[in-house]
Amino acid sequence: MFEQKICIVGDGLAGLIAAIILGKENVRVDLYSSNNKKNIFLDNRTTAISESNYQYIKNNLELSKQNLFWPCKKINLFFENEKKIINFLNFKEKKKNFMYIFQNKDLKKKLDKIILVKNNIKIIKKKIENIDNEKGFIALGKKKIFYDLIILSTGGTSKLYSTIDKGRSIEKNYEELALTAIIKHDSKIENASQFFLKEGPLAILPFNKKEFSTVWSINRHFFNSNKKNIEKILVEKIVALLKLKKIKNISNIQSYPINLNLKTKYFKKNVLILGDGLHTVHPMAGQGFNLVLRDIKKLKDLIFKALKLGLLIKNSFILKDFYNSRKPENNLFGLGINLTNMFFKNNKFFFPLKKRILNNIYRFNFIKKISRSISDKGILF
């Protein structure tokens, strides 16, 4: 018998993973899912996660098959110096992998299958009309359903968040778009690369031997001015950067706006925001989903601690402790990525200083060690 009930609104990656992991704690989980599954499987984005986060979800999600994830032991960083592309820093792991890359749609399909066989996770495909933070219920038409904890994980923006944050957040509109595509090739591309170009950072994320995803963050004006030829420009850029003779195919070209949004308020009473709604960061550093996974891990640990002590989830210390624990790292990462993006912007006034720093950064091994540790396990407070 499951005495305590958790409601998760949203069936994206964050919502699905949270449902499975929290469902291990002998509670009832109701997962409110989208009625339109077509949109989920049109998500052609690719995500990178750290070694420690990979081990965590592999063990907790019981992922027996390894072919969902492409391991990378190395990531190479380049910057555009006038008309030259210079490799200024490389991160490499010998005994373990630096990161794992997967396609969102493939992992979502797997998570859906896992949830279907879980007796304590119920999928409800109904539209939520309202959420009452004070009394802890959701409204489905005239019906009210009460929960011990309500988790909102409905993407970067949702009207459901408004009753919690009241517009309080650290925000920035970059006036940029992330241009994503899937590239098929016949070359040997096994590891990730990040190119800091004058138009904006471009990432290469392989997810199998003959395919990789690219994410190019570009100015909105540049995109609009070159919209008709953007595919040709992207292909020519990739061929030149990777020194390819040709590519076999480019597909699934999509674009989405880039914003910084760091919530300053995470919860109200027993309602919590989780996932992109809590923190949306620049895709340049690939840390967004790592933060989400560390959030889920912390929430699970706090719930487990409360249940072990025989405490109720409702009106407990859990959400306050979660906020105090996770907000510092989430904000530091978000603002740090923002500063990194500003540093690599094409600015002629700061270019001489930037050039000097990047030409000498390889000498400072401690920077690499610290960066590697933080990107893998986060900032430990």
Task: Specify the residue positions occupied by each region the protein language model found.
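C-terminal helical "tail/cap" subdomain of flavin- and related membrane-associated enzymes
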Residues: 2, 301-381
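FAD/FMN-dependent oxidoreductases across multiple families
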Residues: 226-309, 313-317
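Glycine-rich FAD pyrophosphate-binding loop
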Residues: 7-9, 20-45
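N-terminal Rossmann-fold NAD(P) dinucleotide-binding loop
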Residues: 15-16
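Conserved N-terminal helical subregion
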Residues: 70-163, 172-176
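N-terminal FAD cofactor-binding segment of flavoenzymes
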Residues: 41-79
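Conserved FAD-binding catalytic core of PHBH/FMO-like flavoproteins
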Residues: 154-244, 253
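Short beta-strand to alpha-helix junction loop
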Residues: 48-51, 92-113, 224-230, 258, ...
